[in-house]
Amino acid sequence: GDSDTEPGVKQDLGVATARYLRHVLRDGDILAVTGGTTLAQVADFFPEGSDSRQVTVVPVRGGLGEDVKIQANTVAARLAGGLGGRYRLLHAPEDVLPGHLNQMLNEPRIRDVIALGRRADILLHGIGTAEEMAKRRGFDEAAIMELIASGAVGEAFGYYFDAKGNIIYSTTSVGLRLADLEKIPLVITVGGGRSKAWAVQAVLARGYCDVCITDEGVARRLMSLEGIEKYKEDLHEH
């Protein structure tokens, strides 16, 4: 199914992610998480006290000043409650003015949480379209149009990518940066809905995703996109 048109499919995505997470988590693991609607849905399938594991859940993105249910801090606390583990909180906004970033990153409580996130055994993160995330960050219409015109299709960790995974634009955001992902043993990307196909493609092309949990809407769209690219290559060769 397609999360964009069938609400039940987003639930299925949450169920599949929860099942996989329970399968791979080991006692002693550090689980790093981001926020967003998809990960909030995943947290729904970890009822309080349903498990008993020695894990630590860490939010690795600051807050975007929106619905508290989809903040990384809330997702981390809810997952930890369901897993029977511990959690830390990242008391910081997602985006800060460039001149204030270093000062904020040197604040001991923020620095310690981000350092713990960098040592994660597993990272679970959502993915957004470039337009959706620009709107959530409060970009004005002109800036959004400029971003789209420059080829940006997806966003993760404050970076906006084109379909080949090239960085088009990056924000001064608090939390994990792209280079940190290379050192994390298992990076799980979760995102569904046909509208996110290009965004998923961008993250896969970047090469930092070990496991991608998605839906039929994205999978079918990606297969058709690959077909189009192959067709173009064949035309070019002939």
Give residue spans per PLM region.
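HTH-adjacent hinge/linker in prokaryotic transcriptional regulators
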Residues: 1-32, 43-52, 63-69
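Acidic/glycine-enriched edge-of-secondary-structure segments
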Residues: 3, 29-35, 156-166
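Secondary-structure boundary/capping motif
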Residues: 28-30, 53, 121-122, 185
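Short, flexible active-site-adjacent loop segments at beta-strand->alpha-helix junctions, enriched
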Residues: 37, 61-63
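Short Gly/Thr/Asp-enriched flexible loops that form oxyanion-binding sites at enzyme active sites
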Residues: 38-50, 135-144
